[in-house]
Amino acid sequence: MLNRFSYSSNAWHNLRVDGPDADGIAVIVLARSQSRNALTLPMLTDMVQLLSAMDADDSVKCIVFTGEGQFFCSGVDLTEGFGEIGKTRDTHRDAGGKLALAIHNCRKPTIAAINGTAVGVGITMTLPMSIRIAAESAKISFPFVRRGIVADAASSFYLPRLIGYGRALHLFTTGALYPAESGLLHGLFSETVNPASSTLPRALEVARDIAVNASQVGVYLTRDLIYRSLRSPEQAHLLESATLYTRYQSQDFEEGVKSFLEKRRPRFQDTMHEQSGEGVLERGDCVVSLASKPKL
């Protein structure tokens, strides 16, 4: 287990860790403001390690995530790529999903202080967190279909359960950018605050209330009881990872990234009938091929 002084180590990639303070509150800051806090694979890996350490550290009672500057997180840094893709569809594991599961499995309450725009994994990484507080001025997007891929970070598990299937489908299907106070995001944020600079102070206020007044074991067990009534995020993670592996090989993925970097509308070419046997989703004991529709 890391001691509390190790958290501020310069070894973390573009992350700043404050605390834990006397009340047991630790703050993880995405510190890459020059790139709108876009995530790199080393940042994702470091956050998983930090969560593991804080989970085992009794001096940590609550963990707050926020972004440096005016953005919370603009998603994965597409100029650096998505990291190494697994050797096979069955072995590929989405890096955002690994972070989501680390947050889900962390026994300490986690709070997202979404101080600015959050896009892609920048918003899906917050879905497993206990509480999300957003700036009224923040913009939110789940842009995966606009990049030629599918939802990541087990968000196909979390988002419908947080805001309902109808709104989740709308957000995932359009991939558009919405204001934090949009009705489509109703239920996603516990609070929206103004000005944006008050987002972190408000999150720290809530964290302090939890750290000082709530049983840590009680908080963990209560959350565990809630999730035990649902299907596991591991299932969503495996399905997303296998599908992402296939999509990473596609022309649409190449075009989605290229058009984004060139700041133009994408021209997607992939069609359903062109998908091979690799384009298969497994749902329990049911196999659904993307190459053909099942008969009803």
From Swiss-Prot:
Pfam families cross-referenced by the UniProt entry: ECH_1
Disulfide bonds: none
Span of the annotated motif Peroxisomal targeting signal type 1: 294-296
Keywords: Lyase, Peroxisome, Virulence
InterPro entries: ClpP/crotonase-like_dom_sf (IPR029045), ECH/Chromodomain_protein (IPR051053), Enoyl-CoA_hydra/iso (IPR001753)
Presence of the UniProt keyword Protein transport in the record: no
Record has Lyase as a keyword: yes
GO CC entries: peroxisome
Chief location category: other
EC class: lyase
Cellular localisation: Peroxisome
Pathway: Mycotoxin biosynthesis
Entry EC no(s): 4.2.1.17
Reaction equation(s) it catalyzes: a (3S)-3-hydroxyacyl-CoA = a (2E)-enoyl-CoA + H2O; a 4-saturated-(3S)-3-hydroxyacyl-CoA = a (3E)-enoyl-CoA + H2O
Function: Enoyl-CoA hydratase; part of the gene clusters that mediate the biosynthesis of the host-selective toxins (HSTs) ACT-toxins responsible for brown spot of tangerine disease by the tangerine pathotype which affects tangerines and mandarins. ACT-toxins consist of three moieties, 9,10-epoxy-8-hydroxy-9-methyl-decatrienoic acid (EDA), valine and a polyketide. ACT-toxin I is toxic to both citrus and pear; toxin II the 5''-deoxy derivative of ACT-toxin I, is highly toxic to pear and slightly toxic to citrus.
PANTHER family (UniProt xref): ENOYL-COA HYDRATASE_ISOMERASE FAMILY PROTEIN (AFU_ORTHOLOGUE AFUA_1G01890), PTHR43684
Additional remarks: Gene clusters encoding host-selective toxins (HSTs) are localized on conditionally dispensable chromosomes (CDCs), also called supernumerary chromosomes, where they are present in multiple copies. The CDCs are not essential for saprophytic growth but controls host-selective pathogenicity. Although conventional disruption could not be accomplished due to the high number of the copies identified in the genome, the high sequence identity among these copies is likely an advantage for RNA silencing, because it allows knockdown of all copies of this gene simultaneously.
Protein name per UniProt: Enoyl-CoA hydratase ACTT3
